[in-house]
Amino acid sequence: MTTTASNDLATETYGPIVGNRWIQLAAGVVAMIVISNFQYAFTLFTPGLKETFADVPYADIALIYTLFILFETWPLPVAGYFIDKFGIRNLMLLGSALIFLGWTLGGTMATTVFDLYICYGFLAGTGAGIIYISTVANAVKWFPDKRGLAAGLTAAGFGGGSALTLIPISASIASQGWQGAMTSWGIGQGVVAVATALVLRHPPKGWLPKDWVQPKAVVQTRLEFTPKQMMGKTEFYVMYAMFLMVCTGGLMTTGNMSQIAKSLNVYDATFMGIAIVPFTATVAGVMNAVARVVWGAISDRFGREYTMAFAFTLEGVLIFMMTQISGNPIAFMILMPFVFLAWGEIYALFSAMTGDVFGPKNASANYGILYTAKGLASIMAGWGAAAVAAMYAGSFSVPYYIAAVFDIVSAVLALLVLRPLVRKRIAGEA
């Protein structure tokens, strides 16, 4: 049960603007929009990178994307620990500096693919990861009553923010080359990220929203699990396996969209005078954002596991359908955004469920550990998928078949394994 005094504690501590949880949520969404391009715009840089580094196999260029995801995810348990312990502002400033350096140095100083491994992969990846975990965990802390919606809105900034910028970035690449575009966008994104860092705060100790009523369809623990305690629970490993598998198909599509379009013989098509890949990627970004908000809100009402099972099954079907549309650019433009609609929800559902199952106090560190599954998925989705496609004359059909199976298995795990595990354990806490 909450009180008005509890609700006013945030205003008393931070003032009426910074202490408003909706302002906190909005600042987190803006920060996510800033870092979204580092993941979703990579496919726009690949044609220029292939031209600049013509003697380098595409799988080695795709490794830039894989390394970005790895460094975006694997350092997060440590970053999450420091965020929970020392607060969000300093870590956000560090992340902002790293993304600024990543693209700025990549555009001005990179002369080899290895240089981009360091700049785009390590620097930008680590910075984006710090900002990502900071904002998602902050949303979970500020919205215990609407975790699915808050996590979905925050993650929507990451999934859909690129919809605002992919076409402008594509135009920048066309006019400035990939180096100039990477430099100018790196500077702008770094400045905006710093501005959000100056706003973001964790809620004061003891704060709860006014008149909070726990959602009936969502089971939430009353305990606060440390990372070590969380990793002693079977449900954590089930969630990790599910996150890993469902991530694979979406990441593969995100990082290789240009090559997938070429393998489907639709790359040279245009729509309304716009090249098909940036146009489709923009629409897909919108659907990706919609997915995180809509599925997150649905999960608040109907439960996380039921929502996961439905969405993952839909994703598996859509991923399989992608293998059947060779030579059909209209089908590509229609189907691809729906792939993202059925995939983007994982970042809302798993972050919200981490707070439900293991408590909000250590949400940054706990979700940071779970989020490393995305790093493992990136190995299969980036370099791995490109290598397998090369074995089949550039076709991504086999990687997509594997991803579809992963999605269906994850849907089954959500209903038949994760749901009973969580309910049994939390019922035993009473």
Predicted features along the sequence, with ranges:
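Extracytoplasmic gate region of multi-pass secondary transporters
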Residues: F42-L49, K228-A297, A381
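Intracellular juxtamembrane helix-capping segments at the cytosolic ends
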Residues: L49, I130-F143, A151, E345-F358
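C-terminal transmembrane helical hairpin of 12-TM major facilitator-type secondary transporters
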Residues: M252, A275-M353
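Helix-loop-helix hairpin linking two adjacent transmembrane segments in secondary transporters
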Residues: F158-K205
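Interfacial helix-cap and linker-helix signal at transmembrane-aqueous boundaries
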Residues: L49-K50, F82-I83, L164, P168-Q176, ...
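C-terminal ends and interior cores of transmembrane alpha-helices
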Residues: A97-T111, L314-G327
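Hydrophobic core of transmembrane alpha-helices in multi-pass small-molecule transporters
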Residues: G102, F114-G129, L244, A331-E345
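Central cavity-lining transmembrane alpha-helices of secondary-active solute carriers
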Residues: T66-Y81, T282-V294
